[in-house]
Amino acid sequence: FRIICRYKSGCWPCCHGATVSGVFVTMRIGSFGAVTELFRITGRIEMLVGVPKEIKTQEFRVGLVPSSVAELVHRGHQVLVETNAGTGIGASDDEYRAAGADIAATAGDVFAKADMIVKVKEPQPNEWVQLSPSQILFTYLHLAADAPQAYGLAKSGCTAIAYETITDDQGGLPLLAPMSEVAGRLAVVEGASHLKANAGGRGVLISGVPGTAPADVLVIGGGVVGVNAAKMAVGLGARVTVFDRSVPRLRYL
């Protein structure tokens, strides 16, 4: 499975010209971004952007917050949000209405009407079958480890744009880095919890207390996840060691 994507700042969502052939997807970037792709597919420039409620287990986020909806509406687009899509982040249907969105009763209504579907996590099997060749899907996909999803999306014919493959002019991953920051920090919180004796751990308090040494934390890898894990552990008072094969990276740290 091959995805090629290059992010241009100021271009939202960003990609156009995606082609699907079997399970091979190639994405090319252009100055008009997804609006150009929509024009190629439908002959229109204005989008109807759909935001379904996330249905993956333990996923509480939402594809667009009300302020993002307001920005899209200001730029001439329409937004259709499934009812209660923002409940997990404390955003009510009324807030979305105030931002200019219409509220759909079901996810089926969103998939049936939207030009672009904006999500957080990868679509589930009952969502693949609702996608069509005339639609753009913009979300995290993580296709390398999910062949069934790759085949499902290819079969739908939709233009699927993965957040995690978008790169900036410096080769960075601006839409993946925030998730890595969260993962690194939460890793230390979870690890500290499992050090407690009642969780089967050694009864070590990561910060230590007067008379008791803090925990020794080893972080393997000095990338975005590792750096944020190290920052969190240092902030909690642990003694931290980072292993990495890159000497320049270790010097930076």
Predicted features along the sequence, with ranges:
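Cysteine-centered motifs
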Residues: 5, 11-15
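Short, Lys/Arg-enriched N-terminal segments with co-localized hydrophobic residues
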Residues: 23, 31-46
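An N-terminal-biased, well-structured beta-alpha scaffold segment characteristic
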Residues: 45-152, 156
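Glycine/serine-rich phosphate-binding loop and adjoining beta1-alpha1 elements at the start
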Residues: 48, 54, 125-216
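Glycine-rich phosphate/diphosphate-binding loop of Rossmann-like nucleotide-binding domains
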Residues: 52-87, 201-253
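Generic secondary-structure signature for well-ordered alpha-helical cores
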Residues: 74-78, 101-102, 116-119, 155-159, ...
